[in-house]
């Protein structure tokens, strides 16, 4: 039913990043709950297409499928953290976040982001919880709308491994429109993370300067009192 589909979408959009905030592997836990339904939806879409009908919502096509989760809700990792990684790599001023961004950049392109989740940290961090949950919500709304109104074709049984890099994975499951949509939601994720990361990066810069000053004073004291 329509009500059940809406509940399923809410579970996917909210529960996955929410569990990660407490250090639980939200992606694995949510996948275990919803993957049978999502894959059944993908197969149902394939059957509609195989029957010679146009694959549309009006003809009974499903929007929320395994590809919806893997290629749009958790692309580059739970929370769509490529936007955060890009900020750290390009715009961060603190040594900690520049190094973390450089370390996390390559894994992010294979949808692996534990280094960002645990080292930023996002886990148990109320400030970072906001963009971490909000980015998938925005992605979900945009993707759902694009599929509903036919800007992107509904997904069929074509699936790719979850480690397939973004843009390529979108192209493989939904052609050029899906690849473009991935680029759009990932670009938006950068702007969602930007103000929050800018604030914690500035705070970390101050801490680094304080530690540097403390070390400098300590060295001066030791040299002054050394025989």
PLM feature spans:
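Short, surface-exposed helix-loop/turn micro-motifs enriched in polar/charged residues
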Residues: 7-10, 97, 130
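Contiguous, well-ordered alpha-helical segments that form the cores/surfaces of helical PPI scaffolds
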Residues: 16-17, 105-107
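Transmembrane alpha-helical segments and their short flanking loops
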Residues: 46-65, 83-85, 103, 116-216
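Membrane-proximal intracellular helices of multi-pass ion channels
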Residues: 82, 94-104
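Short, surface-exposed loop/turn motifs that are enriched in glycine and acidic residues
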Residues: 71-76, 106-107, 119
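Generic multipass alpha-helical transmembrane bundles of integral membrane proteins
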Residues: 1-91
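Positively charged, low-complexity/disordered segments
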Residues: 213-214, 218-227
């Amino acid at each position: 039913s329509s009500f059940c589909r809406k509940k399923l979408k809410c579970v996917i959009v909210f529960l996955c990043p929410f569990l990660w905030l407490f250090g639980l592997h939200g992606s694995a836990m949510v996948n275990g709950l919803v993957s049978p339904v999502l894959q059944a939806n993908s197969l149902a879409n394939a059957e509609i297409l195989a029957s010679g009908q146009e694959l549309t919502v009006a003809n009974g096509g499903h929007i929320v499928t395994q590809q919806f989760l893997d290629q749009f809700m958790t692309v580059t990792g739970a929370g769509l953290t490529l936007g955060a990684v890009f900020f750290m790599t390009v715009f961060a001023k603190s040594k900690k976040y520049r190094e973390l961004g450089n370390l996390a950049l390559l894994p992010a392109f294979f949808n692996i982001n534990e280094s960002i989740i645990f080292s930023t940290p996002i886990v148990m961090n109320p400030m970072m919880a906001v963009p971490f949950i909000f980015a998938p919500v925005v992605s979900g709304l945009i993707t759902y709308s694009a599929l509903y109104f036919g800007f992107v074709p509904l997904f069929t049984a074509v699936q790719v491994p979850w480690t397939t890099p973004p843009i390529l994975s979108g192209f493989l499951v939904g052609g050029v429109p899906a690849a473009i949509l991935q680029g759009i939601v990932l670009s938006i994720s950068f702007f969602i993370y930007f103000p929050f990361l800018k604030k914690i990066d500035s705070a970390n810069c101050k801490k680094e300067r304080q530690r540097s000053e403390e070390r400098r004073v300590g060295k001066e004291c030791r040299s002054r009192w050394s025989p």
